[in-house]
């Protein structure tokens, strides 16, 4: 286990960091991945999680991690600087197309309609990946467990004239950080072709961050070699965490080492050091 250097003035000094055993990469076929995990999870509050996200960490339920792969640095943490964001013509069109959707923000909670939509989405978009067989308990552990400031956002069509709720189109989980919003996971109606709900959701988060006076929207990891991640490169400007520093990226020209480059890992937040 990794034992970080004790820093009495740092709220991160009580955390420990360890590397997982190797496992098959879910983004690049034939690759082997590892993660670095921050523990214990009950000590990771919103303030501490903000610092971890700035250092490239993400969460899945109460599991806080970042890529820690041997000889690979393909995963680039990315964020959108809200004040500088300039939507493209296509993004403006998507915003106009879906702006009638009614967004309702609430604490994390279970809803049968949400779970049914999640299963339809997984079956259509990720069939055979395992998540298309998630039980209710697995769904709740993945998306509805959090020890930080998290919200569930439901997007529906406007209510019908008779007062019936509009059709559920999309559900998004977000974390509210000290310096921005962090997009956790989004799923939407897979039977609506060419809707670009995912793009609209990020645009909505950018507007929400702007209204809250928060400077960033964190989008997780961008991988140049992964088609699943391509949409993140459509938001400009886009900042990436490379060699421990956030800098503006040009996804078409970003100077990243190749996937098999020598191991290079970003420093731990708060000046922590450690060994595996």
Curated annotation (Swiss-Prot):
<keyword id="KW-0963">Cytoplasm</keyword>
<dbReference type="Pfam" id="PF04376">
    <property type="entry name" value="ATE_N"/>
</dbReference>
<dbReference type="InterPro" id="IPR016181">
    <property type="entry name" value="Acyl_CoA_acyltransferase"/>
</dbReference>
<dbReference type="InterPro" id="IPR030700">
    <property type="entry name" value="N-end_Aminoacyl_Trfase"/>
</dbReference>
<dbReference type="InterPro" id="IPR007472">
    <property type="entry name" value="N-end_Aminoacyl_Trfase_C"/>
</dbReference>
<dbReference type="InterPro" id="IPR007471">
    <property type="entry name" value="N-end_Aminoacyl_Trfase_N"/>
</dbReference>
<dbReference type="GO" id="GO:0008914">
    <property type="term" value="F:leucyl-tRNA--protein transferase activity"/>
</dbReference>
<dbReference type="GO" id="GO:0005737">
    <property type="term" value="C:cytoplasm"/>
</dbReference>
<keyword id="KW-0012">Acyltransferase</keyword>
<dbReference type="GO" id="GO:0004057">
    <property type="term" value="F:arginyl-tRNA--protein transferase activity"/>
</dbReference>
<keyword id="KW-0808">Transferase</keyword>
<comment type="similarity">
    <text>Belongs to the R-transferase family. Bpt subfamily.</text>
</comment>
<protein>
    <recommendedName>
        <fullName>Aspartate/glutamate leucyltransferase</fullName>
        <ecNumber>2.3.2.29</ecNumber>
    </recommendedName>
</protein>
<dbReference type="Pfam" id="PF04377">
    <property type="entry name" value="ATE_C"/>
</dbReference>
<dbReference type="InterPro" id="IPR017138">
    <property type="entry name" value="Asp_Glu_LeuTrfase"/>
</dbReference>
<comment type="function">
    <text>Functions in the N-end rule pathway of protein degradation where it conjugates Leu from its aminoacyl-tRNA to the N-termini of proteins containing an N-terminal aspartate or glutamate.</text>
</comment>
<dbReference type="GO" id="GO:0071596">
    <property type="term" value="P:ubiquitin-dependent protein catabolic process via the N-end rule pathway"/>
</dbReference>
